[in-house]
Amino acid sequence: MTKFIFVTGGVVSSIGKGIVAASLGRLLKSRGYSVSILKLDPYINVDPGTMSPYQHGEVFVTADGAETDLDLGHYERFTDTPMSRLNSVTTGSIYQAVINKERRGDYNGGTVQVIPHITAEIRDRIHRVAQDTHPDVVITEIGGTVGDIESLPFLEAIRQFRKDVGRRDLAYIHVTLVPWIPSAGEMKTKPTQHSVKELRSIGIQPDILVCRCDRPLQAGMKEKMSEFCNVSPEAVITSQDASSIYEVPLMLEREGLAEQVLDILQLEQRQPDLTQWQRWVHQLQNPSRRVEVAIVGKYVRLNDAYLSVSESLRHAAASADADLQLRWVDAEDLENGDPATYLDGVDGIVVPGGFGARGVDGKVAAIQFARDHQIPFLGLCLGMQAAVIDWARNVAGLDGANSAEFDPETPHPVIALLPEQQDVVDLGGTMRLGLCPCKIQSGSLAQRLYGEDIIYERHRHRYEFNNAYRSLFLESGYCVSGTSPDSRLVEIVERPDHPFFIACQFHPEFVSRPNHPHPLFQGLIKAALGSDLTLVDPAPLPAETV
């Protein structure tokens, strides 16, 4: 029978609930328990697909094509378990479902209310995750902060959930802040006490407190919070700031978080096997060399907009025994200045995805710089499209070449709208999304990196390489090394006369894992370090549901 864990947050936002939930998932999985993690987001958007990266950060795409919160990326990377659209729920999607039911007459003329109808829909979504994959444990993270108006229906739903499954099959974890007050020279528990008081006023008594702090809790503080918050001293868990998020599972293991959870849920206490994770963290913390990679993007003022990209580079660098240094470069700066000012000295360049014309010419300039100076280059989604635009303008001599997305009147639309997108009106959830197969050309760099003839990768785009220019592209020395199985859609392009120049239409960053660095990122880092690419051992990618 599935057990349920609910993770709430108090005192401040961005307190790290997602990392705590993901870390707990890793600790339970290391004990042989299967885990699925669900995120409840209180915003009214149906999904984050149309939200600005500056508002929301990265949009993480699941294998089944859901556009979700970046926390699902943490869940997948920490647990090495693919999530689905069932693992992402927003207030908007809940209200949309309830209103659709009302329009169909499912409520038999009754008055539709937050309680019981909205809360019942929320509970049903949680049950659905358990029914879909039958995990041993479902961990649910509730977005927002206790006390927010937006979160109240979710909190009420998880309070009611106790009646659905019984007290022995459910645990509440509250992540809170214990700040250090410099003027007083001590840490304060009062914010935690008030946060728990707010939670208890809703009818939820936390079983475990996870206390975020920048230093070890002072003597007697666990006992004090235990007494005031009505939890056992052993259930007051310290979560001290770490140099890397990947240290957090090991820190929480030392604090006994998993043991407390298993006790509450009356599950068997098993010995964890964290050997692989410990080895990975040791690699991360003890590199013998250094590599610097530039990420040239249009949303670099918020690094979370490219979270999976930076983490994928980190996975690959650690596996190559290298300390990763990231140089964040605003693509717009390259439109008005000399690219060398921003890119000189880097070992590799990544141009990630994005939408809209702003900064695209800067991305093209970065790619031309990488091509001219033989710097290892990896393009992702829009990064591939920008590489094609660079080829068209600067190699093939097609004046005015562009993407039809940015210039509908361009004389050379080397990037064009997918045929199936021609009549699409709505923006949300209508792109080419999720896992798609890709056929790899024998003897190509892509084939050397993947070690496979057919791969599956996640997509999020409306525009593709215009096949009217494919022959000219090939004649000018470039290679189309990956296509859809019917050869209609160009998925990977390369420049064979370059040490490492490869770009893909998909998003490989969504399937990179600490223990399985993605082959494209692994290849980039190897090339950036000057290593022989023949030594790249094709890493098996996580199993996906095709």
Swiss-Prot record:
Mg(2+) binds at residues 71, 141. Pfam families: CTP_synth_N, GATase. CTP binds at residues 13, 148-150, 188-193, 224. The keyword Transferase does not apply. Allosterically activated by GTP, when glutamine is the substrate; GTP has no effect on the reaction when ammonia is the substrate. The allosteric effector GTP functions by stabilizing the protein conformation that binds the tetrahedral intermediate(s) formed during glutamine hydrolysis. Inhibited by the product CTP, via allosteric rather than competitive inhibition. Its EC number is 6.3.4.2. ATP binds at residues 14-19, 71. Gene3D superfamilies: 3.40.50.880, P-loop containing nucleotide triphosphate hydrolases. Transmembrane segments: none annotated. UTP binds at residues 13, 188-193, 224. GO terms for molecular function: ATP binding; CTP synthase activity; glutaminase activity; identical protein binding; metal ion binding. Keywords: ATP-binding, Glutamine amidotransferase, Ligase, Magnesium, Metal-binding, Nucleotide-binding, Pyrimidine biosynthesis. Coiled coil: none annotated. It catalyses: UTP + L-glutamine + ATP + H2O = CTP + L-glutamate + ADP + phosphate + 2 H(+); L-glutamine + H2O = L-glutamate + NH4(+); UTP + NH4(+) + ATP = CTP + ADP + phosphate + 2 H(+). CTPSs have evolved a hybrid strategy for distinguishing between UTP and CTP. The overlapping regions of the product feedback inhibitory and substrate sites recognize a common feature in both compounds, the triphosphate moiety. To differentiate isosteric substrate and product pyrimidine rings, an additional pocket far from the expected kinase/ligase catalytic site, specifically recognizes the cytosine and ribose portions of the product inhibitor. This is CTP synthase. The lineage of its organism: Bacteria, Bacillati, Cyanobacteriota, Cyanophyceae, Synechococcales. The gene is pyrG.
